[in-house]
């Protein structure tokens, strides 16, 4: 249940498309009972963004033939992957100790001495504008639409991922540091509403390009709220949403040698992947996910060919087809944090991966 954006270009629609003079359309219902509501139904005159996102609703959407699609838009394709790293039947005492060490390092990194009042105030201000409340029927919500930035009309007060981030992070800080029960309640109201609006497992929200820049604090503050999330009846929906939008599913397999836009992934979603992996309630699944993530990151740190993104044999870092030192500083910092979190454990990166990181630092120094 909930609203799901479905964007698709004519070229990716099914059926006979020899005649491009469209005169009508049909909606064909599946052979089962249910109700569907249509809203914001448009037929764009201007060309749609090429980065329409295949998802659970329209998995055949988009040929994904452009390099700048090989990142944000592949979340559903990656969801079809399975781990080839087996789930351990039980963890050794050493593995349990390592996970606790990593958990404490992450907590120490993310905690602050006191609640930051600015983000809390911003969360409440945005929440007031969002005007979220249960629907009259009691089966959903009413409130401000939350949509992808491409269709967002800010003049009408419509919101997007950055507003979800503002509300969730603000309420998380207040609930965690000040034990504010109202903020705790608001946190889960916003999370439920975000899922209702399409920030959910299996949804691409029409187009999800560049969303990683607008969701980072959703993850860092979800870590602070993890105990409350674990106890909530909607726990599985929250965790599956976090994992899906972190693109943790990509790390069920090693990184493809031809994968482009790696700097974007490291910079915006590596921390999200890490936190999602650490938030499995079952420690065995944590170990499996963390093993997959470390393997994926190590393999992504291989020297990449040509002009695709990543680290080159001379240590230079490529993004958008060229050397991009201005973007690299934040990227290397994020990867460096992951190295620190897993240092001295069986989940640390390979020696080759760390050597390649070192070469990137040296190239930046020069």
Predicted segments, located by residue:
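Extracellular beta-strand ligand-recognition surfaces/modules
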Residues: 5-43
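Extended interaction regions within the primary functional domain
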Residues: 26-30, 39, 46, 50, ...
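A surface/extracellular/periplasmic glyco- and lipid-processing/surface-interacting theme
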Residues: 28, 51, 243-247
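Exposed low-complexity, polar/acidic, P/S/T/G-rich flexible segments that act as propeptides
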Residues: 33-62
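Extreme N-terminal leader/anchor segments
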Residues: 55-126
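Aromatic-lined, polymer-binding surfaces characteristic
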Residues: 103, 107-366
């Amino acid at each position: 249940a909930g609203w799901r954006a479905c964007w698709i270009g004519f070229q990716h629609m099914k059926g006979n498309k020899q005649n491009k003079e469209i005169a009508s359309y049909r909606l064909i219902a599946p052979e089962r009972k249910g109700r569907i509501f249509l809203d914001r139904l448009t037929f764009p005159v201007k060309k749609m963004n090429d980065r329409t996102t295949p998802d659970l609703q329209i998995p055949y959407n988009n040929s994904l033939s452009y390099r700048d699609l090989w990142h944000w838009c592949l979340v559903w394709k990656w969801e079809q992957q399975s781990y080839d790293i087996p789930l351990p039947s039980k963890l050794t005492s050493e593995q349990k100790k390592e996970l606790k060490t990593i958990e404490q390092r992450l907590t120490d990194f993310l905690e602050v001495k006191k609640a930051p009042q600015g983000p809390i105030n911003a969360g409440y201000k945005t929440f007031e504008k969002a005007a979220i409340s249960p629907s009259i029927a009691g089966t959903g919500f009413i409130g401000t639409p939350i949509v992808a930035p491409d269709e967002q009309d800010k003049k009408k007060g419509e919101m997007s991922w950055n507003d979800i981030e503002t509300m969730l992070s603000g309420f998380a800080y207040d609930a965690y540091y000040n034990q504010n029960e109202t903020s705790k309640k608001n946190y889960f109201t916003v999370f439920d509403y975000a899922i209702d609006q399409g920030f959910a497992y299996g949804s691409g929200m029409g187009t999800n390009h560049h969303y990683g820049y607008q969701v980072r604090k959703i993850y860092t503050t979800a870590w602070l709220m993890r105990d409350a999330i674990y106890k909530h009846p909607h726990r599985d929906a929250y965790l599956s949403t976090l994992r899906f939008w972190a693109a943790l599913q990509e790390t069920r397999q090693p990184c493809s040698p031809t994968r482009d836009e790696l700097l974007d992934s490291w910079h915006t979603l590596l921390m999200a992947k890490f936190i999602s992996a650490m938030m499995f309630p079952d420690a065995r699944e944590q170990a499996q996910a963390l093993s997959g993530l470390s393997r994926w990151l190590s393999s992504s740190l291989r020297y990449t060919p040509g002009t695709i993104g990543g680290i080159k044999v001379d240590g230079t870092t490529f993004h958008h087809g060229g050397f991009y030192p201005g973007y690299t500083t934040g990227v290397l910092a994020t990867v460096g944090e992951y190295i620190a979190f897993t240092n001295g454990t069986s989940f640390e990166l390979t020696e080759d991966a760390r050597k390649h990181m070192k070469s990137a630092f040296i190239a930046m120094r020069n």
